[in-house]
Structure formats: C-alpha cells, structure tokens
C-alpha cells in the first residue's frame, strides 16, 4: 500500500496570502496540506492551488478597519474550533513568535502531538520589555513549543538569536517566487516612462515619498524636468484617499494611476512594463521592512529598483538596485533620474535569484518538515 501523506496545517491568522503560500503547492504529492483562512483575511487568494478551510474568528463579526482590529485584539483574537482542525496533523506551520495564532497552536501542541514550525519574518528583537503584555504571553507560550523556526532572512535569524532561540532550531529559509513566470512575462518598458509603487496603501510603505519623488522629477528639482514620467500606485489600504489627494496637491494627479490589488498572475506583465519599481518603505516604532517580495519579483522581471535602505531590503536587493535613506524623496528622484530613467536595466545575479526561487523555497520547507517527522 502507498504510504499516506503526513498532514500539514498552515496557520497565518488573517494574513494568508499567495506570495507566502504558493511555493508550498509543490509539496502536495508528499504532504496533505491545507491552509486555515478566516473571514477577515486581508489578502486575495486568487490562483492559489492549495486547499483552504474557512474558519471563524471573533473579528469576522466586526466591521473592517484598524479600529475593528484593535477591538478584536482587546477581546482576544483566536480561531474558533481550532482544536478539531489540528487533530491528526503531523505538522502545524504557523508564523512569528508573538502572534495569537502561533500561541493558540503552541498551547494545543502537547495535547494533539504535532510538531510546530514557524516562519519568522520579524527583524526586530523585541524580547519582553518592548512587547505588549499579551504578546509577551504569546512569546512565552510559543518559544518553548516551537520545534523549528524558518527565518526568512539573516536579519530575522539574528533577531531570533537575540530572543534567546537556540541557533540549532533556526534555519534561514527565504520565501520563493516563480522566477520563470516573471522572466517570461510579455511586455516592455513603457514610453513615456512608468514608475511602479506596489504594496499595501499604508504610511509605512512610503507611497507618499514615491509621489514626492515623481513631483520632483516633473518640476526639475535636482536635474532637467521630466514631466513625461508617470506612476502606477498599486494596492489597497486605508491611505488610498489621502494618497489620491496628495498626488493632486503635488500637481501630479494627472500622471498617477491608482489601481487596486490585481490577481497575482497579472503582476509579471506589470513589472515588465515598468521602467522602475520604487519601494519607499519607512521604519516605524514597531516595524521595518522584513523582506520585500516585490524586490525579488522585480529582479526576476529585469525591472530596475530604487528602494529605501530599511530593514532587510539591503540583504534581499544586494547590488541589484539603488538604495536611498528612508524618507529621502530627493535622493529617490536623483537615483531614478541617474539610473532607470537614463535607460539602465541591470541583470540580476542568477545564483542570487536561484536562492529566491519557489522550487528552492519548497525544497527547504520539505527538508524542514521531514527533519521533524521522519
């Protein structure tokens, strides 16, 4: 008789998304995978070829928005009926060491007998002093229970070491992108030039600095005027209306298109049509850019990148793109003028790109699961 596939349950709270989970599609011949998805999930899952299971949460009964998120946090976030969904699992794969859903799994681990794997993006070692009291309790439940932690970057690994996680329980395992899908996409850079600022429309993603850089280019601040340059701001989020008003205030409203998040399969063509990706991430008191999947997607597409030097961005981008100080829209405009708008289109190092491939990411995850259950 053929050996049954070990069951793996994926937990991402309200943040299940295609770019994180898609590489795991490759493991379905070997493992029985499913992702639990709440009714309040923040991302579209179009095109994800993994089984998903709808699970209730207290937030589902609240209106959308940050206020609802704060209310749900105060009430206590949780999956409803999680125990039954995890019963019989060989591996539960959650994320981060201070999240409600990882803590909920950790508290069920001994009773249900599964192994607990965590993907960790966090690059700031909060320890206990800088965590909210509830997150301290989450951390205290999670760290003793976690069998293996998959740090997405070296910076995340180093943060875990400062959290006193033993080094032998940490594996650096970057996420993966379907490189061939992006490299093979049709399309050429547009004329007039098009800048792409993609990501959730929140302050810390720095779309406002991308708009400032565009305005500087149009007005000739720091060099010859470039009124021909346009911008596509791609994403959804609470800053959408404010960013539209700001583009108009800066005098570039007619040169900026705002488009909601598109299905993931449409992204390769957008990269290929862009003159440059602009990633203006801004560190906050509680966050810095933890990876930047758009960087790898742009590299795979051959699209130049100008990005803020924040968090793990330098580690991921390497020598491929130009880095500017976070918030320095003038330097961003100068870098765009000197590089992508001057016709430069760099080639990514194939060895670097291969490390970020979906196939490599899937292989690393397979090895992680097998190391715990074989």
Q: What is each of the regions a protein language model found here?
A:
Residues 9, 186-216, 232, 277:
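Conserved donor-binding/catalytic core segment of Leloir-type glycosyltransferases
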Residues 15-16, 100, 114-133, 145-148:
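A short, histidine- and acid-enriched strand-loop-helix "catalytic/donor-clamping" loop
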Residues 105, 309, 319-329, 336-343:
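Conserved acidic donor-binding segment of nucleotide-sugar-dependent glycosyltransferases
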Residues 155, 176:
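Carbohydrate-associated surface elements
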Residues 241-262:
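Nucleotide-activated donor-binding/catalytic signature segment of Leloir-type glycosyltransferases, i.e.
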Residues 272-287, 303:
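Acidic donor-binding loop of glycosyltransferase active sites
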């Amino acid at each position: 008789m053929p050996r049954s596939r070990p069951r793996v349950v994926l937990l991402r709270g309200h943040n299940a998304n295609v770019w994180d989970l898609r590489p795991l599609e490759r493991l379905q011949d070997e493992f029985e995978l499913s992702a639990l998805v709440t009714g309040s999930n923040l991302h579209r899952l179009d095109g994800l070829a993994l089984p998903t299971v709808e699970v209730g949460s207290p937030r589902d009964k609240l209106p959308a928005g940050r206020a609802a998120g704060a209310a749900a946090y105060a009430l206590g976030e949780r999956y409803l009926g999680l125990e039954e969904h995890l019963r019989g699992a060989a591996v539960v794969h959650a994320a981060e060491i201070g999240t409600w859903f990882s803590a909920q799994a950790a508290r069920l681990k001994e009773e249900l007998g599964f192994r607990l794997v965590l993907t960790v993006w966090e690059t700031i070692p909060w320890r206990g002093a800088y965590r909210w009291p509830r997150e301290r309790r989450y951390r205290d439940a999670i760290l003793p229970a976690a069998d293996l932690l998959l740090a997405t970057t070296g910076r995340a690994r180093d943060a875990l070491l400062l959290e006193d996680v033993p080094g032998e329980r940490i594996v650096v395992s970057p996420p993966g992108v379907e490189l061939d899908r992006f490299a093979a996409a049709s399309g050429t850079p547009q004329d007039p030039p098009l800048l792409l600022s993609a990501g959730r429309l929140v302050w810390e993603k720095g779309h406002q600095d991308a708009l400032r850089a565009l305005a500087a280019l149009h007005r000739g601040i720091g060099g010859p005027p470039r009124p021909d340059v346009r911008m596509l701001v791609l994403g959804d989020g609470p800053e959408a209306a404010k960013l539209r008003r700001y583009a108009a205030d800066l005098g570039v409203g007619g040169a900026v298109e705002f488009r909601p998040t598109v299905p993931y399969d449409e992204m390769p063509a957008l990269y290929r049509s862009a003159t440059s990706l602009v990633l203006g991430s801004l560190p906050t008191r509680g966050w810095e850019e933890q990876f930047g999947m758009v960087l790898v997607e742009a590299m795979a597409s051959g699209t130049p990148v100008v990005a803020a030097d924040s968090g793990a961005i330098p580690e991921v981008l390497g020598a491929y793109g130009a880095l500017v100080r976070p918030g320095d829209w003038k330097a961003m405009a100068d870098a765009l003028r000197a590089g992508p708008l001057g016709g430069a289109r760099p080639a990514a190092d194939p060895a670097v790109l291969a490390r970020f491939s979906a196939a490599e990411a899937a292989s690393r995850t397979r090895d992680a699961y097998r190391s715990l259950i074989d």
